[in-house]
Curated annotation (Swiss-Prot):
Induction section of the entry: Part of the dnaA-dnaN operon, which is negatively regulated by DnaA. Transcription seems to often terminate between the 2 genes.
Role noted for this protein: Confers DNA tethering and processivity to DNA polymerases and other proteins. Acts as a clamp, forming a ring around DNA (a reaction catalyzed by the clamp-loading complex) which diffuses in an ATP-independent manner freely and bidirectionally along dsDNA. Initially characterized for its ability to contact the catalytic subunit of DNA polymerase III (Pol III), a complex, multichain enzyme responsible for most of the replicative synthesis in bacteria; Pol III exhibits 3'-5' exonuclease proofreading activity.
Oligomer and partners: Forms a ring-shaped head-to-tail homodimer around DNA which binds and tethers DNA polymerases and other proteins to the DNA. The DNA replisome complex has a single clamp-loading complex (3 tau and 1 each of delta, delta', psi and chi subunits) which binds 3 Pol III cores (1 core on the leading strand and 2 on the lagging strand) each with a beta sliding clamp dimer. Additional proteins in the replisome are other copies of gamma, psi and chi, Ssb, DNA helicase and RNA primase. Interacts with YabA, and via YabA, with DnaA. During sporulation probably interacts with SirA.
Species this chain originates from: Bacillus subtilis (strain 168)
Protein family according to the UniProt entry: Belongs to the beta sliding clamp family.
Protein name per the record: Beta sliding clamp
GO cellular component term of the entry, any: cytoplasm
Principal location: cytoplasm
Cellular localization per UniProt: Cytoplasm, Nucleoid
Length: 378
């Protein structure tokens, strides 16, 4: 195998597939990156058997030549060393050549590295997925769906199913749900698919986070193929495979209150900054909570009290307060996480009592809902 490639594209592809490579793997060859040079271009693959990423660099794009292939072939190189080497090479082009016994030479300018490679035939095959019935979602929408839900997945392995995001497709609508049983994030999106197609799968939160880092912010369509055990995301020149989590995701529809006793509408930025300030003292206290008091026709008060340190009280003018008087305590971290993913100058918070879950939404937008469980402080 021998080819010459543009360094910037090489670095980009290697960084993408590196996201799937784990140093803690039971299969030693998976600590490497598989490189295959063919007549069409060069592909790079990284995998930890849960996530597999393949990045393809075509020979040319438009009229610009990116790769020159002198001899097709394949090799597996140690990911950690290879990724560091290509980043630090001096020139704009890199030549990679495999000689006898899988010895690989990497040249750029006057720098030359010799790396011991492994036989690419020993590398596990990527999952074979039949690509009929793909769902298509614009890249920017897909990134939003992930960003607005994945932060709420559980980080604890006690209920593994909650470490993933539930993707449910029915009646041409996708519903993404994530919860760690203290909070819940929900996002809906319309899909351009037949109404009778339905799916209900749980994608690991880690997979979605890594996928989001690889995708560019553009409107190009991503093809999504869902099977019994795997999901494949096909973007431009990138294939991203992830295993699905086993088990049934809990039904969360009953958690969402249908009516409310107190409703407030406030400026998102002012509310977020006030919670952020109150959390400065809450962080130190044992009971990491912020208290919100709302009186109709008056303002909202945000406070936090840490006996060892002191206390903070701040009043915010609400655009609207309706319903009953309310005192409620909650985790400032959960509230900040939810506020950061809502897009809009104002937010509507609906409470159904001091010990009941409450909802945070943007007025006039039903596609995204954040739910938080309050904290008992007595």
């Amino acid at each position: 195998m021998k080819f010459t490639i543009q360094k910037d594209r090489l670095v980009e592809s290697v960084q993408d597939v590196l996201k799937a490579v784990s140093s803690r793997t039971t299969i030693p060859i998976l600590t490497g990156i598989k490189i295959v040079a063919s007549d069409d271009g060069v592909s790079f693959t990284g995998s930890d058997s849960d996530i597999s990423i393949e990045s393809f660099i075509p020979k040319e794009e438009g009229d610009k030549e990116i790769v020159t292939i002198e001899q097709p072939g394949s090799i597996v190189l140690q990911a950690r060393f290879f990724s560091e080497i290509v980043k630090k090479l001096p020139m704009a082009t890199v030549e990679i050549e495999v000689q006898n016994q899988y010895l690989t030479i990497i040249r750029s300018g006057k720098a030359e590295f010799n790396l011991n490679g492994l036989d690419a035939d020993e590398y596990p095959h990527l999952p074979q997925i039949e690509e009929h019935h793909a769902i298509q979602i614009p890249t920017d929408l897909l990134k939003n769906l992930i960003r607005q839900t994945v932060f709420a997945v559980s980080t604890s392995e006690t209920r593994p199913i909650l470490t993933g995001v539930n993707w449910k497709v029915e009646q041409s609508e996708l519903l993404c749900t994530a919860t760690d049983s203290h909070r819940l994030a929900l996002r809906k999106a319309k899909l351009d698919i037949p109404e009778d197609r339905s799916y209900n799968v749980v994608i690991p939160g880690k997979s979605l986070t890594e996928l989001s880092k690889i995708l560019d912010d553009n409107q190009e369509l991503v093809d999504i193929v869902i099977t019994e055990t795997q999901v494949l995301f096909k973007a431009k020149n990138v294939l991203f495979f992830s295993r699905l989590l086993d088990g049934n995701y809990p039904d969360t529809t009953s958690l969402i209150p249908q009516d409310s006793k107190t409703e407030i509408i406030v400026n998102t930025k002012e509310f977020l900054q006030a919670i952020d300030r109150a959390s400065l003292l809450a962080r130190e206290g044992r009971n990491n909570v912020v208290k919100l008091s709302a009186k109709p026709a008056e303002s909202i008060e945000i406070s936090s009290n840490s006996p060892e340190i002191g206390k903070v009280v701040e009043a915010i003018v609400a655009d609207q307060i309706e319903g009953e008087e309310l005192n409620i305590s909650f985790s400032p971290k959960y509230m900040l996480d939810a506020l950061k993913v809502l897009e809009g100058a104002e937010i509507r918070v609906s409470f159904t009592g001091a010990m009941r879950p409450f909802l945070i939404r943007t007025p006039n937008d039903e596609t995204i809902v954040q739910l938080i469980l309050p904290v008992r402080t007595y």
